[in-house]
Amino acid sequence: MMPFLCSLASGSSGNALLVVSAGARVLVDLGLSQRRLKTGLKAAGTAPDEIDAVLLTHTHTDHFFTAAVGFCLEHQVPVYSAEENLRHLSRSLAGFRELGKAGLARAINGGTLQIGDLAVESFDVPHDSHGRALGFRLAFGPTRRRRTVAVATDLGHMPGECLRWFVDANAVVLESNHDAEMLRASGRPWNLIERIAGPWGHLSNEAAADALAEIVGRSHPGRVASIILAHLSKDCNTPQLALEAQAHLAHGRTHPIRFLAAAQWAVGPRIEV
């Protein structure tokens, strides 16, 4: 079986990304009910008992909440995240301490985490969650055919120290949250608009396009094969607008790039890595 990734859900109502290699199956975030999760996993050809780990980006409830605790306890799935995030969830999320008691809440303290044949590295991203917000770079396969996936779904801007983790990734999963004009005209309270558009909020389509242009420009030709636009706002964005913002990257390339806008309520296709 070819390694692949599959978005089970992406957005403010819940997030989960499945990454499958030859020797491991992991979820990046688990912000879904058990029913939605199991339905999504089945659609992606994966059983709950096959999940080896959850990589938690940050502590907001659309990325991890009470139902995830029950799933991880039932199927003995470890949750890896920053120590600060584990401490916060132990205080704020019902049942999370039970994961700690079961040895399933495990801190990422830098370096490389090995899960089966997946080598996982984490990096800090700018987002206004309690604890630390993380992105992940996952690598697998033999040295000469090494494949990589880089993920960051909630970040207010793309500093250089974050961007470097995406260079030469075969698959990039990056937030493209809102259209700036739709956000300004949304009728939301101005302080919320400022928070979303601010440097610790969420990437606009335009900011995502700028970051992706630099990522592709700094990568070896043909290395970036797939780009998944994530965490689209249901009120202040559309898949069409998010994809149109990337049009300059999609056309006229010697090595074509596949673009996909991840959906909130539909399981995405398998993207081979």
Give residue spans per PLM region.
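Metallo-beta-lactamase
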Residues: 83-146
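Cap/insert and terminal regions of metallo-dependent hydrolase folds
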Residues: 160-262
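Active-site metal-binding motif and surrounding structural segment of the metallo-beta-lactamase
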Residues: 35-81
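Active-site neighborhood of phospho(di)ester-bond hydrolases with catalytic His/Asp-centered motifs
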Residues: 28-31, 51-59, 80-83, 150-153, ...
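Short helix-capping segments at alpha-helix termini
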Residues: 45-47, 95-100, 144, 218-221, ...
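Metal-dependent catalytic neighborhoods of phosphoester/phosphodiester hydrolases
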Residues: 65-75, 90-93, 237-244
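Active-site environment of divalent metal-dependent phosphoester hydrolases
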Residues: 60-64, 87-89, 130, 157-160, ...
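Conserved beta-strand hairpin/beta-sheet module of binuclear metal-dependent hydrolase folds
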Residues: 1-44, 132-154, 171
